[in-house]
């Protein structure tokens, strides 16, 4: 019978470290290597740090500043069973501004924001947050990254954000 020996240029399987960003279907060099792929499913504003409503019944703009009266923190939320450095994967793939925790501290100032005459403004303090979904990957015998089961999800804050919306004042007359 025939005897098959491994090709001289075959590489041993290697551990690429805890976070190895990959794209399913793209070429990989070493079958058996593992990694992860991750996508942002949605990004939204979470305004749970505080809100203030201020009306300007004057004839000129009204500068408004508010103080944070209670510390509010947004922490990350990840699915169970993640056995690699998820934060590294997200920072490599998208942005280093994603963190595991961001806070507003007591005494911090929000503003100033100018409220136009005859307008009511609602200021909401919070965070820009993204929901992520990902999957573990493996380099297949065809030298392409493929899904390897092990899906995961995460929600992480990207940045603190103040949302300001205005409307016409109510006419109480």
Question: Predicted segment positions?
Answer:
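Secretory targeting and sorting signals
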Residues: 1-12
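Core pore-forming/fusogenic effector modules of secreted, proteolytically activated toxins
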Residues: 11-69, 103-173
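Membrane-insertion modules used to breach or fuse lipid bilayers
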Residues: 62-114
């Amino acid at each position: 019978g025939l005897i098959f020996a491994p090709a001289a240029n075959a590489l041993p399987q290697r551990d690429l470290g805890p976070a190895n960003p990959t794209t399913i279907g793209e070429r990989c060099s070493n079958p058996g290597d593992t990694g992860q792929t991750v996508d942002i499913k949605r990004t939204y504003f979470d305004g749970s740090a505080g809100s203030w409503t201020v009306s300007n019944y004057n004839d000129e703009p009204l500068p408004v500043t508010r103080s944070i009266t209670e510390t509010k923190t947004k922490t990350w939320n990840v699915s169970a069973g993640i056995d690699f450095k998820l934060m590294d994967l997200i920072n490599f793939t998208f942005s280093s501004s994603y963190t595991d925790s961001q806070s507003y501290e007591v005494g911090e100032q929000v503003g100033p924001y100018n409220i136009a005459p005859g307008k009511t403004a609602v200021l909401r303090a919070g965070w820009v947050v993204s929901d992520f979904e990902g999957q573990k990957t493996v380099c297949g015998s065809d030298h392409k990254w493929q899904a390897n089961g092990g899906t995961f999800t995460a929600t992480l804050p990207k940045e603190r954000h103040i949302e300001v919306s205005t409307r016409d004042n109510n006419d109480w007359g």
